[in-house]
Structures are given as C-alpha cells and as structure tokens.
A protein has these predicted regions:
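Short acidic, glycine/serine/threonine-rich loops at helix termini
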Residues: 110-112, 155-156, 197-198, 269-270
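Outer-membrane beta-barrel transmembrane domain signature of Gram-negative proteins
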Residues: 119, 187-207, 212
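Bacterial N-terminal signal peptides that target proteins for export
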Residues: 1-10
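Short glycine-enriched, charge-decorated loop/helix-capping segments at active-site entrances
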Residues: 114-117, 474
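Alpha-helix capping and helix-loop boundary segments enriched in small/acidic/polar residues
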Residues: 119, 162-166, 198-199, 235
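Exposed, low-structure sequence patches enriched in small/polar residues
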Residues: 45-47, 200-204, 219-492
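Beta-barrel outer-membrane channel/assembly domains of diderm bacteria
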Residues: 21-114, 121-146, 152, 159-162, ...
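Bacterial N-terminal signal peptides
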Residues: 9-17
C-alpha cells in the first residue's frame, strides 16, 4: 500500500512536468481562510480550497484540494476534513469521456442535481465516470455512473451530509434535443442503488422528460418526473411525482416570468441530503422540504420605463398539499434610479411569512425596507446601505407573539480598484437567547485589499448577527460570530 503522502508527491511531480510541456494551459483559484473566535477558548478555524483546470489538446483535467482544520478540542461533528479530487477527461469536439469528480444536473433538477456554491459553502458532487456526446440537431446525450458526496457548512463546521450513504451507486442517462428552432424536448433516467435497501431489487428510480417551445417573445417550459422507490423497512412500491412549468415573455424594456411547481414525494431521500433539488419559487431560497411535499408558484416582473429607472416585483408562495399550517409567502418590490453615471439609488421592500419552516418556530413574519446609495467621485467610491426589519415571531407556545426589530447599517469607502473599507453595525432591540445567544449588538470593520489583479485579501474584525439563511432550497442557521476573519483569494 503506497502512503498517501507518497502518492501526493508523485502527482505534484507529474503536474510540474506537465506544466513545462508546450501547449499546456493551467488556470485556477485558491481560497484560504482563517477565523479566530473571541470566545473563552479562543478557537480557530483554518480552511483552504484550491481548484485547478488543465488543458492539453483534447485532454482536460482538474485538481481539487480542500482542507478544513478546526482547533482542538474537536467536539461532536466538528472534525478536521481533508479532500483530494481530480478529473481526467478526453474531450474532442463531439465527445467527452470523463473520470473523477464532476457536477451534473438533469433538466431543472427534478431527477438529479449537483453543484458547487462557494458563497453558501455547499459542494454536492459526483465521483465516477461520465460520457457526453454532441450530435446533430442540437442533441446531447449524457450517461453517468458514480457516487454522491454532499459537503455542507453548518453549525460552524463542515460535514458530509450523506456520510452514512457514500457507497450508494448512482447511474443515469439524459437526452436533450432541439430538432426545430422553436421546439425542443428531452428525457432522463436515474437509478440509485442504496447500501441500506432491504433487498437487491429494492432501488430508487427517477424517470422524466421535458418540453420547451418559443414563439416570438414568449418561451414556455415544462418538466415531469416520477420517482419509483421502495418503502423503507417494510418493502413495497413507494411512488412520487413532480412537475415544473414556467413561461417567460420579454419585450423591449419589460419582462415577465411565471412558474408553477408541484412535488409529491419526489425529493429523495426524504430528509438530510437529496439526490435531486427541484426549483423553489421563493426568491430568498427558502423551501419546505426540497421536493418531498411542496406545491407553489412564483411571478417576477421587471420594467425599465426610462433609461435611468429600473423596477422589479417578485411574488412567491410555497405550501404543502394537505397541511395549511406549513408554508412560506414572500414578495418584494425593488426600484433602482441612476440619474447619472456617478450616482445610483436603490430602494426595496421585502415581506415574508414563514410557518413551521424554522426549527422551534411556528411562525415568523418580516417586513424589511432597504435603502442603498452609491456615489463615484474621481477615484473614490462611497456606498451606504441601511435596513430596518420589523419581525413578528411565534414559537407556538406563546399567548402574544414577540415583536422586535433588526436594524443594520454599513458605510463603505473605496479608493481606486485596490482598497475598500467598510464599517457596519447590526442589532436587535430584544434579547433572544435561542436565536442570538442573548446578544443585541454586532459592530464590524472590514478591509478589502486588491494586492494585485489576481490576489485579493479581505480582513473582517468584529461581530456578525447570523440567523436563518437559505440558498436554492437548502437552509441553515448561522450562529452569531465574534472575532476575526481573514480571506485570501488568488487566481492563476
């Protein structure tokens, strides 16, 4: 058995040799972070993530390194993590054969969706092999086989959400074609063989298809997916169905998007992580259970009646099929006015009501106005942002719900493209032990220094309020933070 360090040295040596070869192009990005907590033990958090792409003729490759190191003592789920990923692909014009780590989404994600989200620190990837063929009539065929790995940052630590199911096998195929300029369709099949399935014939399948059409300024899209699984423990067929419909219309200066979705026992597995992540109509990214039992719709309208004025309105609603006590409604109006090239004003108002979405919260309503202003003066940039959130919260065991306010303000000054300074403050006018550990004020100071065009250093000192945050239907609760965060992003 060759030690891991020896294998890594061999790979690095091989990479150095390849770099010297003519015709090889290399590019990538490295993000290094260090957190220091102002707590009783002065805990620290070190993280580094590097992604490198290599290309030599028809050969492609990627190299990914991830390191997470929390300071001791390691308690519960807080453990260090080391990940090493690679991809090797042969990619002529009409064909690609890939082995290693990859991301793949079929359609809108009703059958399969994987992705990488650095801002939300969520990395859901496949590891295996994939073949892609590009055929006439704008036709693409994808076949894959591999295993899922879902890495997510929550409770101030990285976790592999599917750590008990990393050996489950995923196989799938997808066909998409557009035989006519105005019409296209597709079909897909995904099969998951789980280690914990009660019998060899007990597996989960996703079978679906989609159609799209365009006429003038109008585009319509529809996707249907059926899940065929096995009831856990007792066996027997477990079926689910979901569909997604959308339509867009756009003319000069105006656009309208409408979408409708219905997911009934489609999300799999039912809790924790999912192989599929269907769209949510909620702009802020909130979902109930990511396709297990959801139904909703959303509408977005934009307008530019005059050149300096931009208007946008969004409305989304999501609820369960037979449960009136669970759901979310969100609407937002936004306007942006730029009287000149140096000055921009933006105002928006967001309203959201959540019922039984957050843990231990029966209902939470927010009304949040926000104002932003940006002014360019020579080489200087001045930006001001202020918001004031009116919150009503009910834990389900209260005679009178809580009513409190969450203000926030920040002022930024930038000089040229090299330096940006920001001072900010967040607060709450009520002591909330469960949500904010009884804290009520979070000041901070941040400096962003563009050392070169390819290297950016960001240092933040102070505190962050945290709270419930979502992206693409995946949500987490971020605890308040006090300390120092330093981040260096390097591109090469």
């Amino acid at each position: 058995m060759i030690p891991r360090a020896v294998r890594l040295c061999f790979l690095v040596s091989a990479f150095v040799s390849l770099v010297s070869a003519a015709g090889l192009t290399v590019q990538g990005v490295n993000r290094a972070e260090f957190w220091a907590f102002f707590d009783s033990v002065y805990a620290t958090h070190t993280e580094d993530k590097m992604d490198m792409d290599l290309r030599y003729g028809d050969l492609n490759g990627t190299l990914g390194l991830f390191m997470y190191e929390p300071s001791r003592p390691w308690v519960g789920l807080q453990q260090p993590m080391r990940l090493f990923d690679y991809t090797v692909a042969y990619s002529p014009k009409q064909l690609e054969i890939l082995y290693g780590k990859f991301f793949q989404t079929f359609g809108k994600g009703l059958a399969l969706r994987t992705y990488s989200d650095d801002d939300f620190r969520h990395y859901k990837s496949m590891n295996g092999c994939r073949g892609t063929a590009h055929l006439p009539l704008s036709t693409e065929v994808v076949a894959l086989a591999g295993r899922l790995r879902d890495v997510f940052f929550q409770e101030n630590t990285y976790q592999v959400l599917n750590r008990t199911d990393t050996t489950d096998q995923v196989m799938g195929a997808d066909l998409s074609t557009q035989p006519l300029e105005w019409f296209g369709f597709g079909g897909r099949y995904v099969r998951v063989n789980g280690q914990n399935d009660p019998a060899p014939k007990a597996f989960t399948e996703f079978v679906g298809g989609n159609m799209s059409a365009a006429y003038g300024p109008v585009d319509v899209y529809g996707e249907l997916c059926q899940r065929l699984g096995t009831k856990p423990g007792i066996g027997g067929r477990d079926k689910g169905l979901g569909y997604y419909l959308s339509g867009t219309a756009a003319v000069s200066g105006y656009s309208l998007l409408a979408e409708y979705m219905d997911y009934d026992t489609l999300g799999y597995p039912a809790a924790g992580y999912h192989y599929n992540d269907p769209p949510t109509p909620i702009k802020s990214g909130v979902a109930i259970d990511r396709g297990v039992d959801e139904k909703g719709f959303g509408v977005t309208a934009t307008a530019t009646p005059t050149n300096p004025l931009y208007l946008e309105a969004d409305y989304g609603r999501l609820y369960r099929h037979k449960d009136n006590l669970t759901g979310v409604v969100e609407w937002e109006g936004k306007s942006r006015f730029s009287p000149g090239t140096d000055l921009t004003f933006e105002a928006k108002f967001n309203h959201m009501v959540q019922q039984n979405i957050e843990l231990h919260v029966a209902g939470r309503g927010t009304n949040k106005p926000t104002l932003q202003a940006n002014y360019l003066l020579g080489q200087s940039t001045i930006a001001l942002e202020a918001e004031y959130d009116f919150v009503t919260e009910d834990t389900g065991r209260m005679v009178v719900p809580w009513k409190y306010h969450e203000p926030a303000v920040s002022l930024s000054y930038g000089y040229g493209a090299a330096l940006l300074f920001t001072v900010g403050w967040q607060g709450v006018d009520m002591k909330l032990d469960r949500r904010y550990n009884g804290e009520q004020s979070w000041p901070m100071f941040e400096t962003v220094w563009s050392i070169t065009e390819r290297n950016v250093l960001r240092v933040r000192i102070g505190a962050e309020r945290g709270g419930y945050t979502c992206s693409g239907g995946v949500c987490r609760f971020e605890s308040p933070f006090k300390g120092v965060k330093a981040q260096l992003i390097s591109r090469f």
